[in-house]
Swiss-Prot record:
Residues reported to bind ATP: G39, V40, T41, G42, S43, G44, K45, T46
Cross-referenced Pfam families: Helicase_C, ResIII, UVR, UvrB, UvrB_inter
Organism: Escherichia coli O81 (strain ED1a)
HAMAP family documented for this protein: UvrB (MF_00204)
Note on domains (UniProt): The beta-hairpin motif is involved in DNA binding.
Gene3D superfamilies hit by this protein: P-loop containing nucleotide triphosphate hydrolases, UVR domain
Coiled-coil stretches: none
Matches recorded under InterPro entries: Helicase/UvrB_N (IPR006935), Helicase_ATP-bd (IPR014001), Helicase_C-like (IPR001650), P-loop_NTPase (IPR027417), UVR_dom (IPR001943), UVR_dom_sf (IPR036876), UvrB (IPR004807), UvrB_inter (IPR041471)
Main localization (coarse): cytoplasm
Residue intervals passing through the bilayer: none
Gene name of the encoded protein: uvrB
Annotated ranges, domain UVR: 633-668
Lineage: Bacteria, Pseudomonadati, Pseudomonadota, Gammaproteobacteria, Enterobacterales
PROSITE patterns, alphabetized: HELICASE_ATP_BIND_1 (PS51192), HELICASE_CTER (PS51194), UVR (PS50151)
Domain Helicase ATP-binding: 26-183
Descriptive protein name: UvrABC system protein B
């Protein structure tokens, strides 16, 4: 049920925020297709966007460049809009190996994937909210430009139930099977249903805590009620309910039959081409694989790798863009591209990499040519589909500036009064010894240091040198996976070590108020890692500390250094002037280390409270906040097994308590991974 957006915040817009909000809203109301918000680190860009959403009351999609930042934004938006639908849409693969063929070694690699069920449920919840409500904010990663089920077919497949409706039990069960729900009278879990006499219990695929009970009298729906799937306790009775398919890729039977005929036609044409070119092995391989898939589709309605036939299943022509999350966003929706200088190039690069891999599969007879149309959006298709857009970045790229016509909305003043770091340029000759002395000063007063180098070798050597001199130092590099990277950053904030050395990873979105010094070695080596944008982003990591300082080691000042220093000075002067006019004393940010990770804690508690007031709610003290993501995943699996065991033994009180703890652990796990 849609409600108006209601912003929940103890703060009012201040600094540059009111002017930025006014200009963005005016631009949107005047029909501007592209606007850029240049917001410095710590200026409250997310709060500004939340105010724009609340004032204009428009459904919004926020694109983030990676899962880490998406989780951070999801948590912040949840806090700003607790009464509205804030959803999370990222890739649901914990592990994904696409099918590929390496001709040089004649090696075929089968597709292998591990799906995270909780994120799959959140994706289904996101599309349901976009179809049903207007008060929706979906925080998505670049996963949003990949093919998703056709929204028209998805809507056609929905099962609407209303009290008083004439429908027999078999018809309901048949429709549930078409929606890919499985009957399971023993273990009642997401995406299943069970039958007891004239009562059908259905656990919706997009829900994690509420199930539907359908009570029939002869061939009439007598009662619909929502209940807690663990305790069986009725939460409410309702007049109607819509059951959505278990997956985005569900297709009506008649469409599958039609698609199979089209696949057979393409197979015949492709076989002819391969035989004419004397490719007998490829022809045999393609025929065998495709006919097996056709048999599976005929018997079960789906097959492994069915996404490779998505063009036929959605009725598209060759080369047409696939349906994506953008097709679920209303025409008057709003798109916010966070860290746009990274996100926009990412979107542009997805199509070509995917295409190169699939062309090899088609050439060697592993797939039909139509598999090339199972792909992410091309950049020009993304541009055509995108609604009115706000690009958000501290260092907007040329694309965003060009699209906005050079009219940039500035948000340089921080409400906290924090100034941009003081920048010093020092000679390269003594950079390592000078850095060691600076590190010791910072470590003595419990502050942290980030050091960025140009090469992996130099980062390793520097780490070794600092360790030999007794400093607590860690090295962050590209071989470290996302989960471990989060752990290292958390340990730095907790004071497990004082110095973090990296190359190109200490940039966008890293929120570390404890860092008071950023050292950039070889800053005068002009190039990608020492461009104006890279320097500003790296310097910005010290902008959340009241003693923030950046040291650029270089023997000359390059054009990029001059621009970065000039821009930082401009922002610093503007902030200083604002502080003097309003009598503000800069204050450091005391952000708890668990804030980002515990993004769903309060929501989980609220959900639990509504279900059974007599039950004790699991307190945060009982949830191990400092667990690593790998340990969290193991703990979740253990608790799920224990919860089901309690439920089967009819020990509902114990099962419910474990379920409440699982809510917190799952939210922690999403943020951490």
């Amino acid at each position: 049920m849609s409600k108006p957006f209601k912003l929940n915040s103890a703060f009012k817009p201040s600094g540059d925020q009111p002017e930025a909000i006014r200009r963005l809203e005016e631009g949107l109301e005047d029909g501007l297709a592209h606007q850029t918000l240049l917001g410095v680190t710590g200026s409250g860009k997310t709060f500004t966007i939340a105010n724009v959403i609340a004032d204009l009351q428009r459904p919004t999609m926020v694109l983030a460049p990676n899962k880490t930042l998406a989780a951070q934004l999801y948590g912040e938006m949840k806090e700003f809009f607790p009464e509205n639908a804030v959803e999370y849409f990222v890739s649901y693969y914990d592990y994904y190996q696409p099918e590929a063929y390496v001709p040089s070694s004649d090696t075929f690699i089968e597709k292998d994937a591990s799906v995270n069920e909780h994120i799959e449920q959140m994706r289904l919840s996101a599309t349901k909210a976009m179809l049903e409500r207007r008060d929706v904010v979906v925080v998505a990663s670049v996963s949003a430009i990949y093919g998703l089920g056709d929204p028209d077919l998805y809507l056609k497949m929905m099962l609407h139930l209303t009290v008083g409706m004439i429908i027999d039990q078999r018809a309901i069960l048949r429709r549930l099977a078409e929606l890919q729900y499985a009957r399971n009278d023993q273990a009642f879990q997401r995406g299943t249903f069970r039958v007891r006499g004239e009562v059908i219990d259905i656990f919706p695929a997009e829900s994690d805590d509420i199930a539907l009970r359908v009570e029939l009298f002869d061939e009439e729906v007598e009662r619909l009620s929502l209940f807690d799937p663990l305790t069986g306790q009725i939460v409410s009775t309702i007049p109607r309910f819509t059951i959505y398919p278990k997956t985005h890729y569900v297709t009506p039977r008649e469409r599958i039959v039609q698609a199979m005929e089209e696949i057979k036609e393409e197979l015949a044409a492709r076989r002819k081409v391969l035989l004419e070119n004397n490719k007998l092995l490829e022809e045999q391989r393609l025929t065998q694989r495709t006919q097996f898939d056709l048999e599976m589709m005929n018997e079960l309605g789906y097959c492994s790798g069915i996404e490779n036939y998505s063009r036929f299943l959605s009725g598209r022509g060759p080369g047409e863009p696939p349906p994506t999350l953008f097709d679920y966003l209303p025409a008057d929706g709003l798109l916010v591209v966070d860290e746009s200088h990274v996100t926009i190039p990412q979107i542009g690069g997805m199509y070509r990499g995917d295409r190169a891999r699939k062309e090899t599969l088609v050439e060697y007879g592993f797939r039909l040519p139509s598999a090339l149309d199972n792909r992410p959006l091309k950049f020009e298709e993304f541009e055509a589909l995108a609604p009115q857009t706000i690009y958000v970045s501290a260092t907007p790229g040329n694309y965003e500036l060009e699209k906005s016509g050079g009219d940039v909305v500035d948000q340089v003043v921080r409400p906290t009064g924090l100034l941009d770091p003081i920048i010093e340029v020092r000679p390269v000759a003594t950079q390592v010894d000078d850095l060691l002395s600076e590190i010791r000063q910072r470590a003595a007063i419990n502050e942290r240091v980030l050091v960025t180098t140009l090469t992996k070798r130099m980062a390793e050597d520097l780490t070794e040198y600092l360790e030999e001199h007794g400093e607590r130092v860690r090295y962050l590099h590209s071989d470290i996976d996302t989960v471990e990277r989060m752990e290292i950053i958390r340990d730095l904030r907790l004071g497990e070590f004082d110095v973090l050395v990296g190359i190109n990873l200490l940039r966008e979105g890293l929120d570390m108020p404890e860092v008071s010094l950023v050292a950039i070695l070889d800053a005068d080596k002009e190039g990608f890692l020492r461009s104006e944008r890279s320097l500003i982003q790296t310097i910005g990591r010290a902008a959340r500390n009241v003693n923030g300082k950046a040291i650029l080691y270089g023997d000359k000042i390059t054009p990029s250094m001059a621009k970065a220093i000039g821009e930082t000075e401009r922002r610093r002067e503007k902030q200083q002037k604002y502080n003097e006019e309003h009598g503000i004393t800069p204050q450091g940010l005391n952000k708890k280390v668990v804030d980002i990770l515990a993004l769903g804690q309060n929501i989980a508690k609220t959900k639990a409270k509504g279900r059974g007031k007599s039950r004790p709610i699991v307190e945060p003290d009982n949830v191990p906040m400092d667990m690593s993501p790998k340990a969290l995943q193991q703990k979740i699996h253990e608790l799920e097994g224990l919860m089901m065991q309690h439920a089967q033994n009819l020990e509902f009180e114990e099962a419910a308590q474990i379920r409440d703890q699982l809510h917190l652990l799952r939210e922690l796990f999403i943020a951490a991974s």
